[in-house]
Amino acid sequence: MSDLQKPELKVSVISDYICPFCFIGHKRLESLRDHYDLKINWCFVEIHPDTPPLGHDVALLNYSEDTWNSLMQNLQQLASEENITLSPQTRVTNSRKALLLAEASKQLGADVFYPLHESLFNAYFVEGQNIGDEQVLRKLAADCNLPDELIEAAWSDPYTQGPEDKTPQALLPYLQYAGAIQATSVPTFIFNKEILSGVVSKDELRQAARNMTG
């Protein structure tokens, strides 16, 4: 069935590239394309703006080794359901530059945005790269055919480097939107008036889509 024959489905998603459940949620949401002309408004919100630009060791999260290993085991089980093989998570990174880059890429259309979108998730969670590192991001952007001038424009905001309590202008509307709908976690999926948060199953997403499209 072509997109012209499918019912249109507009969904907003509040998301961050350093959230593993956002990666899993992205994969699950994409499964709706089989039945809908899916239009997603990705709303990028930093979940850890206080993380230093180049990140820090996960030990600073103050989990015990047993607790951390249990969390990772459960996470890998969820990821494997979507054919994702996670690399060992040893560092937490700052996502601000990655989010700004993805936001800027939207102006070049879905054919540029989605390869970068996927690359950012894969780089961090599958390949274990630091997507807070500018050189890593430049390489990912180049591989997705983003021109240098767009990269520079994406990072031209005075708050690109921080401080943590100042949100760049390009991302501020999303933070305000999240506050307006009282979203307290990522991912949050907005199907018109129906809001789903956290680890949402494919069945729940399908039901929300049916509710929205009648």
What do the PLM-derived regions correspond to, one by one?
Residues S15-Y17:
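Functional transmembrane helices that embed catalytic/metal-coordinating motifs
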Residues P20:
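Cys/His/Pro-rich metal-binding microdomains
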Residues F23-G128:
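Structural alpha/beta surface segment adjacent to cysteine/selenocysteine redox centers
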Residues M1:
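Non-catalytic, low-structured ubiquitin/UBL-interacting segments
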Residues L4-V13, I24-Y36, Q107-D111, P115, ...:
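C-terminal cap of thioredoxin/glutaredoxin-like
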